[in-house]
């Protein structure tokens, strides 16, 4: 039984999570500089460690209903191609789960495409949707986000 740590966050009223090993840092919300002619899911950029960090809005990317949240956070994600931030409504907790507890998403009826989903985790009365960060951006979208 392998235990992994996941970062649980909210988009709207739903719980989502990602492996904590893919997360570099959690930032408080800060003003995002908008970029002209950018894809709708790319909210813009922020200054992060003296470089430019693209900010991906998962609510827009997944086509979810936007809710006003005063707890918005930016999760800084490490990828081989570079770093980017994902804008979330709030961050809930870091939780230890067993890999065996991650269920196959095939039976899932959800508002977001299954291609983004790594699996489902039952947590008390809630279902946490595990996001596959490798599939958030297509190759073409990565080129736009990282090459500008």
Q: What are the roles of these predicted feature ranges?
A:
Residues 1-148:
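An acidic, low-aromatic, low-complexity terminal/linker signal
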């Amino acid at each position: 039984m392998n235990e992994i740590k996941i970062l649980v966050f909210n988009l709207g009223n739903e719980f989502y999570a990602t492996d904590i090993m893919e997360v570099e840092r959690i930032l408080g919300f800060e003003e995002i500089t908008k970029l002209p002619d950018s894809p709708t899911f790319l909210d813009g950029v922020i200054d992060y460690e003296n470089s430019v960090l693209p900010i991906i809005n998962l609510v827009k990317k997944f086509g979810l209903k936007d809710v006003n949240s005063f707890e918005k956070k930016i999760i800084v994600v490490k990828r081989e191609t570079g770093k980017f931030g994902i804008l979330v409504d709030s961050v809930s907790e870091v939780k230890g789960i067993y890999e065996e507890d991650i269920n196959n998403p095939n039976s899932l009826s959800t508002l977001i495409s299954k291609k983004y989903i790594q699996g489902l985790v039952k947590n008390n009365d809630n279902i946490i949707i595990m996001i596959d960060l490798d599939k958030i951006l297509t190759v073409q979208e990565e080129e736009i986000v990282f090459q500008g």
